[in-house]
Amino acid sequence: MATVSELCCAALNTSIGNRIAFPGSTAYNESLSSYFGVNAQLPPSCFVLPLSAQDVSVAVQTLTSQPDPCFFAIRSGGHTTSLGASAIEAGVTMDLSGMNTTTYDSSTNTAFIQPGARWGSVYETLLRDNVLVPGGRTASVGVGGYLTGGRNSFHAARVGLACLSIKGYEIVLADGEVAKVDQDSHPNLFRALKGGSNNFGIVTLFDMEAFSTEGTIWGGTVLYDISTKDQYIAAGTAFTDNIPNDPYASWVGMFAYNSTTDQTAIFTSLAYTRPVQSWPQAFSEFYAIPNITHTLRSATVLDLAVENSFPYGYRNVLQTGTYSNNAEIIQKAVIILNNQVKMAKLRARGKDYALFAIVQPWVPLFWEHSEARGGDVLGLERFETNLLNIAWDYSWDNSADDELLYELAQSAREQLDEYARSTGAYNEYIYLNYAGRTQDPLRGYGLENLEFLRRVSEKFDPDGVFQRLVRGGFKIDRA
């Protein structure tokens, strides 16, 4: 007897058969293997491989009209590490990777980007017209999940978080309607989609305001010895406070342990988004620290995004928190990381794993123009001081270590949260795109925004399709 999910796939095969991939087919295997994290490769009963908004609409109408519930997941790039957010076992996964085009209209200065595109291809297309949009700092990241979660970029200090550059959406709603959404036509839904993740529908096109690029930018990766950490941490906190004085500069700091070398080092991603020939003044304190090696040069955003790409083929977990910008928080994160390394050495069964504590500035300049652009639901306007996002990014090769690494990542974040609360440095905001499966980023947006999300969901999805049937990700009804 066929299972419910198999019956759902059979119905899809009738309504949109040329867009369905079943187990054992080449298309099915290619889709399953293309997730960033191996542990995210949950095998569905079938994949839907749409090429248009109409394909998505037919699929949604089919899935929501069956006598038994058809559970489904939605993926664009498959880069999320929150289990089940973009995949489902024994259900239906809608893989948007075939919807991957980018076009640019110079008359309106608008980039039209489909959700299955990767940021590398987006940049490659837009740079032909000497324009860009704020997007992923890693070439392989998909557009859809990135933009519906808000997202930071190389250009955040100049143009705001990436979602704020969205002028309009094409979205398939719960009843299958293909709707055009902007600040004038659907102001509440427009706002809710900026940070609302997969709670309202399936976005099939993003209309983004572009900006002119001055050609090459300057940046790359710098490697420092861990012995420089005190000077490095001081440089990072000073840089964060200085961002308003030079919004072209961006910094990501990574304290990283790799089991294959048994070494902890400091990796730094620097970018200066206008042409310069050497270290800009904004990075002077990093320049003063002796480095082991670096790749700093004049390059394109595409070049840096390719360089920043992490290898596929590993298992992965993320946890994240937000804190006041101060050196003590980063120092505590390094202490926690060192203790985590000791635990991993004692308990890990695999020999190939990496533990990263990643530090990034979050400053009011990133969100200060939100309301003028239709608003968002991130709730960051509550905060007027400079913040840090610290993410625990762990990868490993042996499935026997899954629970250990999940436990360690969560423990690291909880320990830093506890320390931050005790020192008055804790901030309730949780960056959705880095949040772990045990976290609640929607509640971190603030209760007012959470209630707003509930009202918008009730209006545009009264039957709760994207709460009940799309169970993965961070859901409003579970916040």
From Swiss-Prot:
The modification Pros-8alpha-FAD histidine is found at residue 79. Its cofactor is FAD. Pathway: Secondary metabolite biosynthesis. It holds the Pfam family FAD_binding_4. GO terms for molecular function: FAD binding; oxidoreductase activity. Residues 40-213 form the FAD-binding PCMH-type domain. InterPro entries: FAD-bd_PCMH, FAD-bd_PCMH-like_sf, FAD-bd_PCMH_sub2, FAD-linked_Oxidoreductase, Oxid_FAD_bind_N. Its EC number is 1.-.-.-. Keywords: FAD, Flavoprotein, Oxidoreductase. The keyword Oxidoreductase applies. PROSITE patterns: FAD_PCMH. The keyword Transcription does not apply. Belongs to the oxygen-dependent FAD-linked oxidoreductase family. FAD-dependent monooxygenase; part of the gene cluster that mediates the biosynthesis of the polyenes aspernidgulenes. The carbon backbone of aspernidgulenes is synthesized by the HR-PKS sdgA, which accepts acetyl-CoA as the starter unit and performs malonyl-CoA extensions as well as regioselective methylation and reduction. The resulting nonaketide offloads the HR-PKS by intramolecular lactonization to yield the 5,6-dihydro-alpha-pyrone-containing hexaenoic acids preaspernidgulene A1 and A2. The FAD-dependent monooxygenase sdgC then installs the first epoxide on the penultimate double bond. This is FAD-dependent monooxygenase sdcF. The gene is sdcF.
